[in-house]
Amino acid sequence: MPVVSLAELLESGVHFGHQTRRWNPRMAPYIYTSRNGVHIIDLVQTAQLVEQAYTYMKEASENGKHVLFVGTKRQAAGIIAQEAKRCGAFYINQRWLGGMLTNWETIKTRVERLKELEALEESGNLARRPKKEASMLRRELDKLQKYLGGIKNMRKIPDIVVIIDQRREHNAIQECQKLGIPIVSLLDTNCDPQTVDLPIPANDDAIRSIKLIVGKLADAIYAGRHGQPVDDNGDYGDFDEAIDEYADETDASESE
């Protein structure tokens, strides 16, 4: 069994890109065709690149490497948090703070402040503070949990960063490039593959697409830590036939 099948990718809408007028020509090698003014991503390549990313992240996890997931768009935020927690990775799903990685020593002081406030609350000492002071401290705690809760236990900059929506997370990409941190990224048809190390051509707007791909990457991290391998000798069949069959079904349902 492959890590991900063409059927799974099709059912999750991974193949739907953006309107053809919004494309980045550098994504041309990963585009299969266009239908009704929308680019269709070549899912054979997507499946193969998911395999590569899975193997890479599984081996990294086996060697004790740490992964940071970054996805601040509404469709990705909940998935990022859920999957990162499941596999023991870190995550940023609200807003990328400038210098999150390049100014890590400063960010780390805010993380320590978060831990300090959480300890204060858990001990009951926060509730015993004067009402006004307690209110201010709780507001500070809420804000720190919102933006830094996903990296609370991150002791150093990550070894790998996974990006959802390369265009939106351009600041994170720039910081990773500056520090030489490998980037694994979902790339829609309006993205630039030259800015990442391991591209995964995929619809980065649909919840099901994001959940499928991020879930597979989380599986890799989990397998690397817990020794649960996946048989990755995949047979992807005939994508031409699969996409034509899917398109025929879609056209038929739209004409009804």
UniProtKB/Swiss-Prot annotation:
Q: Spell out the InterPro entries in the cross-references.
A: Ribosomal_uS2, Ribosomal_uS2_bac/mit/plastid, Ribosomal_uS2_CS, Ribosomal_uS2_flav_dom_sf
Q: What cellular-component terms does GO give this entry?
A: cytosolic small ribosomal subunit
Superkingdom, natural source: Bacteria
List where Acidic residues composition bias occurs.
232-256
- Which stretches does the entry tag as region Disordered? 229-256
In its UniProt record, a GO molecular function of this protein is: structural constituent of ribosome
Q: Which GO terms describe its biological process?
A: translation
- Which keywords label this protein? Ribonucleoprotein, Ribosomal protein
Q: Which family does it belong to?
A: Belongs to the universal ribosomal protein uS2 family.
Under which name does UniProt file this protein? Small ribosomal subunit protein uS2
Report the source organism.
Answer: Picosynechococcus sp. (strain ATCC 27264 / PCC 7002 / PR-6) (Agmenellum quadruplicatum)
